[in-house]
Amino acid sequence: MTDVTIKTLAAERQTSVERLVQQFADAGIRKSADDSVSAQEKQTLIDHLNQKNSGPDKLTLQRKTRSTLNIPGTGGKSKSVQIEVRKKRTFVKRDPQEAERLAAEEQARREAEESAKREAQQKAEREAAEQAKREAAEQAKREAAEKDKVSNQQDDMTKNAQAEKARREQEAAELKRKAEEEARRKLEEEARRVAEEARRMAEENKWTDNAEPTEDSSDYHVTTSQHARQAEDESDREVEGGRGRGRNAKAARPKKGNKHAESKADREEARAAVRGGKGGKRKGSSLQQGFQKPAQAVNRDVVIGETITVGELANKMAVKGSQVIKAMMKLGAMATINQVIDQETAQLVAEEMGHKVILRRENELEEAVMSDRDTGAAAEPRAPVVTIMGHVDHGKTSLLDYIRSTKVASGEAGGITQHIGAYHVETENGMITFLDTPGHAAFTSMRARGAQATDIVVLVVAADDGVMPQTIEAIQHAKAAQVPVVVAVNKIDKPEADPDRVKNELSQYGILPEEWGGESQFVHVSAKAGTGIDELLDAILLQAEVLELKAVRKGMASGAVIESFLDKGRGPVATVLVREGTLHKGDIVLCGFEYGRVRAMRNELGQEVLEAGPSIPVEILGLSGVPAAGDEVTVVRDEKKAREVALYRQGKFREVKLARQQKSKLENMFANMTEGEVHEVNIVLKADVQGSVEAISDSLLKLSTDEVKVKIIGSGVGGITETDATLAAASNAILVGFNVRADASARKVIEAESLDLRYYSVIYNLIDEVKAAMSGMLSPELKQQIIGLAEVRDVFKSPKFGAIAGCMVTEGVVKRHNPIRVLRDNVVIYEGELESLRRFKDDVNEVRNGMECGIGVKNYNDVRTGDVIEVFEIIEIQRTIA
């Protein structure tokens, strides 16, 4: 093959001359652009490029071995510790030339070892022969000297000398034999050591592609690096075997893959065998008893608190968490291992699995605090607590205003009561405490609280209006609280007043007047003119005497929260109705989730008071937060314990709420599948008092439908803050303020984010506007409206449109491009579109009643005489929330 130049070779390889020259230089051949290249040089270049482009020369393996170590802890619980052992090993792949070189070196090393072995053997033999000669010469010298020494002795000693000579010759021969055996043994050990070292080095450097998998390869993933891992395992075993303290250390060590399969007793016995190998004594088999699986289930006493997670319940029963989850699924409840479940569910699961359940009460601290109270002994008569209930605008507040001789109703927004007002009134016959409840439908929970805190219910019914829905609800609340009812028939001075109608309607709900044999007193009053007010007060006091109301006046007070709100200057304020004892300024009170010291007390007139007895409503300041309306108020001795109880109640409420929320059932799963199609109206609600927040939230949530849901993102008492505005911006919510306003920082966020902020003072307007917002999210309803009928009189053929129906418009108007139906014998046979509409060969847009026209139906030619063409249009009707 002729030589070619660098330029020609570069053109053949389709590369640049500079790149080819560089490649030759990398291969160790210096060339210029005009030099020629021989076939040998080309082959050298090709070998160099193949070696350069071959696969990676190094392979790095990283192995992680994970295991779990169970450490026993206190209380029968065990702690699991995850152990991870990481190993990293690098294998170098030799190229073929390197492999040949290593093979040649290996062969040379073997020959050198053989020659060294032979030389060592010959050297040992020479040394043994020389040693024997030296010993024989020394022996001969000693014999000669001995012979010269004893030459003058007597002849009778000759025999002993000869015997001694024979003995020493025999010893010399024995010594020579031992020296030869020692030399041979050393030679064999040296040869065996050299051969073992050579075999180990050869195995470390070999790269086998067709190695058989070892027994423990099933414990690892089969990958391309399987053989390398086997080599690593073999090397690890050799290293660890060298560290064993006895000959049986390697045999006694368990295999890698089966380290969890052997029992603890087997491992102890193996370790004992290793320890006993050094001293020549082997310890007997371990006397420790191995764990045997129990033949039957162990029934345990399981102590369950008010809430517990599934994992904790499994630990108490000494079973796996998956078994508890399976048992819960059999009972119809789905749970995860970290989910909090309530006490009843945990009891059912534990009893289902055959364990005995011990229910633990966690409110011992609370009971101890409540029992450590000085409540006094003697009970004294107290004033009745009267709640005025009734329908909206039936005159409840006006009636109470006349009694108090004030004008409170005009101060309420919209003239309706939106808070519970608590007042006490001194009369000639004694004191009466009045609670004025809202009558609007949204304030159901407020009325229920009023009924529970009261002794007597005054049911106000307008004589001209009769029994209304909230009147019925007030009757139900009174019956549920088992409170006597005094009926005040108001607006008796109106011409259209009909008291007998009121009696008849109330009798249907179990409220019978005394003259009809019932237990309820009926009093005719007029809040405007003041008619019958004294009779009403007398009836209330008479009913109170019948009830014999008594309370302990001395001692630590207890009562109920009627209303609560957050005042910007004073902080959390709670309206408290004292039931028993006397509440003093400076007392430590526990109120639901809140606690604190009474910093100040005010009566309903805003005057500072130092104490309040039974049936007296007061406003207290100094609580840690705004309590929920309806919470129990209790005076305790120790503020530290009160704080602990309040924090315990908060945690308990949070756990119970979480357990209730996470309790997922099968039927809810299918309901959640279609939630993506539901529109949501997000609202951030702030109001002036806690009762209004509760009432508005309940009312708005009741507006939710299947298509639009109302979601209260956040709610609270007090003004609208920057946090509320940020929350509304993040959740795309409407900011609603009920009798509150936004501060300066909140207004900046609202303007920057263009949030929808709305202020309300009347609950009617708030609910109506939320309804309007929800209505805008409803998809419109599509309705078909017939606009005209045309009767087919004759059918013509048209080359452009096909069958043309000659029609007479009998009703309405026929318009072009409107959808139509073709009716035959009042049965719809086709539904399509009107394509052509002509009158006297002129295209028209519409034909009115009584006119003739030609109609071409799009993609339909089976029009017959006598058919009726019905023209309609589709209109969208906006739906509203009822």
From Swiss-Prot:
Protein name per the record: Translation initiation factor IF-2
Region listing for G2, in residue ranges: 415-419
Biased composition (Polar residues): 67-81
Start and end residues of each stretch annotated as G5: 526-528
Annotated spans, G3: 436-439
Modified residues annotated as N6-acetyllysine in this record: 800
UniProt function note: One of the essential components for the initiation of protein synthesis. Protects formylmethionyl-tRNA from spontaneous hydrolysis and promotes its binding to the 30S ribosomal subunits. Also involved in the hydrolysis of GTP during the formation of the 70S ribosomal complex.
Protein's organism: Shigella flexneri
G1: annotated segments: 390-397
Keywords from the named record: Acetylation, Cytoplasm, GTP-binding, Initiation factor, Nucleotide-binding, Protein biosynthesis
Residues involved in GTP binding: 390-397, 436-440, 490-493
Taxonomic lineage from the root: Bacteria, Pseudomonadati, Pseudomonadota, Gammaproteobacteria, Enterobacterales
Keyword Repeat found: no
Family as reported in the entry's similarity comment: Belongs to the TRAFAC class translation factor GTPase superfamily. Classic translation factor GTPase family. IF-2 subfamily.
Localisation per UniProt entry: Cytoplasm
Region annotation (Disordered) ranges: 28-296
A Pfam family recorded for this sequence: GTP_EFTU
Membrane-spanning ranges: none
Database matches in Gene3D superfamilies: P-loop containing nucleotide triphosphate hydrolases, Putative DNA-binding domain, N-terminal subdomain of bacterial translation initiation factor IF2, Translation factors, Translation initiation factor IF- 2, domain 3
Ranges annotated as biased composition (Basic residues): 244-258
Biased composition range(s): Basic and acidic residues: 92-209, 259-272
Region (G4): 490-493
tr-type G domain sequence ranges: 381-550
GO cellular component: a single term: cytosol
One example GO MF annotation: translation initiation factor activity
